[in-house]
Amino acid sequence: MGSEDNIKETFFISHGTPMMAIDDSKPSKKFLESWREKIFSKKPKAILVISAHWETDQPSVNVVDINDTIYDFRGFPARLYQFKYSAPGSPELANRIQDLLAGSGFKSVNTDKKRGLDHGAWVPLMLMYPEADIPVCQLSVQSHLDGTHHYKLGQALAPLKDEGVLIIGSGSATHPSNGTPPCSDGVAPWAAAFDSWLETALTNGSYEEVNKYETKAPNWKLAHPWPEHFYPLHVAMGAAGENSKAELIHNSWDGGIMSYGSYKFTST
């Protein structure tokens, strides 16, 4: 991987529910299907996905030759359990990730030689890169730690961009609890306020505010009662760097409470 493979962008994608794979009425599905045409036309050497649906005590990376498709959901249409996204893995990239994290002071970086791709990874990737011909590695989140930890993970991984690796955080701009009632009339005010705060903070480059969102963001406890769907954003943000420019590249809603806000970060 040489300098000609340089990638300036990292991304955060709100992946929603697994239904995005089959529900043509979802604007987020059309957005991801148009990925190469409208958002990112370059074919990366490999893809690193940080998914909300892999939580571990220490940073962990999967080391496999071929990625299995994990059906980590229940009660959905049978068709969803028939999809296969058998993208190759990349043990070489996994080793590089370990080295970068260790070199940045992360004392324990684990490997998982059995794990494939959960729906936070394969559902969007199936829409973005349906050929499944690009090697994919997945990195876990540590939901018991904070945004700054995940931002530093991203900072450590930034050299991968110069090696042709596309870094994608996959979570959700808002991810309320299952018991949160949907809004029957537009977007719930609490969700709109958080979503607007996030867009303003990111596009203004106020990344430290986003790292410390628990003291800065309105209604954060409603938007993210658990943080695992937010932390992939921090990794993408950290990998882009503090002087990068953030841009909202998609926004739509489920039930007026779940935001599909998705962002591109471009390094200067």
UniProtKB/Swiss-Prot annotation:
Pathway(s) where this gene product acts: Pigment biosynthesis; betalain biosynthesis
Species of the source: Beta vulgaris (Sugar beet)
Pfam families, per the entry: LigB
Keyword Oxidoreductase tagged: yes
Protein name: 4,5-DOPA dioxygenase extradiol
Location relative to the cell: Cytoplasm
Gene3D superfamilies according to UniProt: LigB-like
GO MF, one annotated term: stizolobate synthase activity
Names of the cofactor(s): Zn(2+)
E.C. designation(s): 1.13.11.29
